[in-house]
């Protein structure tokens, strides 16, 4: 047995499923998950000593690559001053200043510890601010594991074939209206059915938890217009897209202004950080200045803030997003060319530093139904064959891939060459 197999066997006796987040168990592709010993740049190294070109990037945060020296040094320096204080620090102020400068729609920001905390808190705030209970989310989108959001959720819920999670009371779920991504008519129908009851829409601007599905041109502006018409707030969940699709996020890339924004992943530079923020009048409703309660023992943790501050300063440097786009475009085009040579029907969506691979005869993939029609069994074989080639893709047909600026064009070309060999045998 390999070291990964031995560790996985031991882990399953101690940790449910052997992992601390379901998708890591390779449930979506079968087999034994890799146990990782270290990572550097664009590469992961497993406990058995094998190296992989990494397109998971810790599920998005590693936009600069693994073990970036600026982030590593910031963490070491912060740790030497203490691990946690439970009191305000200067770095929290500096971090808030930087985030609000980089994302102009965020007049104010509140730091939390995860993307789930960010979305959960933003929805509570929207409900408290509007005095309404219902929310709209979209089929196949995932916004963390808060009870009100595990209704036809994407990500692991799709992989496990569970559109709803046991343990979510029906009384919670009834306030969550699920519409079709990229379908404005379904959203208007929901508003017309409950014109005075909907507090907010929450949306992944690029759906990254049913692989990678970008919005159609009129979709996000249409959501903004419907929120304005019916007095609801628009929450854009940029946990995945923030600082990746563009410096100011997908909202800037697509030209839509939300009332609230949720951030995670890149904002922590690899540490557990989330944030939500937006209009000043809405944020003023948060405790302690307002009646909507939200709190966290480790929110604004000094080490996490130092990591995030270092990461965002690096991400804000000229050329970062142009490089991400160039690398991702080359990968997407190369995969399509290789698939066509082998007669494999393939769609590759990509935006900025995100991409998605779909085995399908369809010309495009634009919604949950399109994603579910793709050939998952072929993806499973593709995943394992690419893994054998030293390429680590997301171990699920329903998860996006992530590029970093640490990837070289040689890495991309080697990945395309590996895919060409795999397609010939697929």
UniProtKB/Swiss-Prot annotation:
It catalyses: (S)-4-amino-5-oxopentanoate = 5-aminolevulinate. Keywords: Cytoplasm, Isomerase, Porphyrin biosynthesis, Pyridoxal phosphate. It is found in: Cytoplasm. Its main location: cytoplasm. Signal peptide: none annotated. One of its GO terms (biological process) is protoporphyrinogen IX biosynthetic process. One of its GO terms (cellular component) is cytoplasm. It is an enzyme of class 5 (isomerase). The keyword Calcium does not apply. InterPro entries: 4pyrrol_synth_GluAld_NH2Trfase, Aminotrans_3, Aminotrans_3_PPA_site, PyrdxlP-dep_Trfase, PyrdxlP-dep_Trfase_major, PyrdxlP-dep_Trfase_small. Pathway: Porphyrin-containing compound metabolism; protoporphyrin-IX biosynthesis; 5-aminolevulinate from L-glutamyl-tRNA(Glu): step 2/2. Pfam families: Aminotran_3. One of its GO terms (molecular function) is glutamate-1-semialdehyde 2,1-aminomutase activity. It comes from the Bacteria. The modification N6-(pyridoxal phosphate)lysine is found at residue 265. Its EC number is 5.4.3.8. Its cofactor is pyridoxal 5'-phosphate. Homodimer. Belongs to the class-III pyridoxal-phosphate-dependent aminotransferase family. HemL subfamily. This is Glutamate-1-semialdehyde 2,1-aminomutase. The gene is hemL.
